[in-house]
């Protein structure tokens, strides 16, 4: 499994060659490209969009325009589509149903793939229960999008869920359908249990860990120069190594 280290600090791209996962929103105020050392992937920033606005504020063309500009930084492997998350509090924000979120997710991918870009845009399965995800799979199928033939398919609405058993059942189901899944923000305990069934996953948990525990990396432990290491690449890399060795 490829593990992408989540980060909200753009210059981390120029300081490490480990695979990174970065939100499109972090690039919004950046006007020039970076000299990335390694490969990385782009999150759509959809959770923040829906949480803040109850809808997407970017059209498909605007999103692709931003993805194309971001792609001037080397190493971008893929970008997630503009999906519609299905956690209950997101559904409450939009006032729509899970089924409508799924329809909009499928329609978004269809529109994005008609636009001009060299970046691979990956589809995202959305839902909350296993039956929801099955329904989303069928929606893609009915629109002639065969998820089994896709190089990678995102599994959405899992990163803020604590019930690892539910997510494991969902991952197992689609793994047995030979779908190459990317788990967005999968919990560390989840990766231990079903990581081998994922093609890739990402996590920004190191930053929250540093902020709330107030632990420092080896570089800052003896002589802390910051309140915490929530933005510290050294802390992130040490956390990543610890997780990899568990």
Question: What are these model-derived regions, one by one?
Answer:
Residues 68-201:
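Eukaryote-skewed repeat-based solenoidal scaffolds used as protein-protein interaction platforms
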Residues 1-15, 45, 68, 80, ...:
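Alpha/beta catalytic cores of nucleotide-metabolism and tRNA/nucleoside-modifying enzymes
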Residues 23, 32-33, 44, 129, ...:
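Generic serine detector
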Residues 1-108:
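Non-catalytic, usually N-terminal nucleic-acid engagement modules in DNA/RNA processing proteins
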């Amino acid at each position: 499994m490829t593990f992408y280290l989540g980060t909200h600090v753009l210059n981390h791209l120029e300081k490490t060659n480990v695979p990174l996962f970065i939100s499109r929103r972090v690039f919004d105020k950046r006007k020039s490209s970076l000299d990335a050392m390694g490969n990385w992937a782009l999150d759509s920033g959809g959770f923040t969009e829906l949480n803040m606005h109850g809808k997407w504020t970017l059209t498909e063309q605007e999103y692709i325009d931003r993805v194309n500009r971001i792609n001037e930084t080397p190493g971008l492997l893929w970008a997630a589509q503009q999906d519609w998350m299905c956690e209950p509090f997101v559904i409450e924000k939009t006032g729509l149903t899970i089924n409508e979120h799924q329809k909009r997710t499928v329609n978004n991918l269809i529109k994005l793939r008609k636009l001009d870009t060299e970046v691979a845009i990956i589809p995202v399965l959305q839902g909350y229960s296993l039956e929801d995800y099955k329904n989303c799979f069928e929606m893609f199928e009915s629109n002639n999008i065969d998820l089994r033939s896709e190089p990678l398919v995102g599994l959405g609405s899992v990163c803020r869920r604590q019930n690892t058993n539910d997510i494991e059942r969902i991952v197992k189901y689609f793994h047995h359908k030979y779908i190459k899944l990317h788990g967005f923000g999968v919990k560390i305990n989840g990766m231990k249990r079903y990581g081998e069934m994922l093609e890739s996953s990402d996590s920004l948990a190191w930053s929250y860990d540093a902020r709330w525990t107030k632990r420092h990396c080896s570089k800052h432990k003896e002589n802390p120069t910051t309140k915490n290491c929530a933005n510290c690449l050294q802390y992130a890399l040490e956390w990543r190594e610890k997780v990899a060795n568990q």
